[in-house]
Amino acid sequence: GAEVSVEMVTVQQLADVLGRWAPWDDAEQWDNVGVLAGAAAPVSGVLCTLDITPAVVHEAVRRGCSAVVSHHPVIFSPLKALVPGTAPYLLARHGIAAVCAHTNLDKAPGGVGDALATALGLSGIEPCGSYCRRGTLPHEMMPRGFAAHVQAALGVPVRLVDAGAPVRTVGVVSGAGDELWAEAKAAACDAFVTGEMGHHHALDAREAGLTCVVGTHHR
């Protein structure tokens, strides 16, 4: 039979596909997303992960993957040196590319924010504000019962900041919500679920009548 030539996909082409789903320009200005190492390299396999750690790089090597796609950026603060044993050093040493989709993936339709809202059993999920998603519970819950529902749905410990009122409409922000509670409040939400929230932001939200359930972003 005739030989068929198959063009190898490059890391940049992989990033372009991700960018069509979660546009890179939608990332926050402080974020560091896109191809963080090895744009022109061919892709022999892709490993997907939340964080690129040394263990993840070693797994990519073991599996023969030449690219790793992660949610959290492997390079966030400016690097002054490549320290042996760290993830950026190991990526460079083994010639493995890194593509990171962070806040752009949080905001994307069908992205992390929508996935969180779906996991909580919300219906009528829609954007509200720059980052927040809003949806409705199947039935009204009191704050303690709602916190237990969130903990069971996500399988992580949660912290409840109880504003005392029943909960039916819920706003969610994956990652660190902090001041974004105001978007949920402005959208007439009864509660706000996020992965991280500073103490003073939580107190401000409670004073405004918004119950907050805070998960564990690092888990």
Where are these regions (language model features)?
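Hydrophobic structural segments
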Residues: 3-219
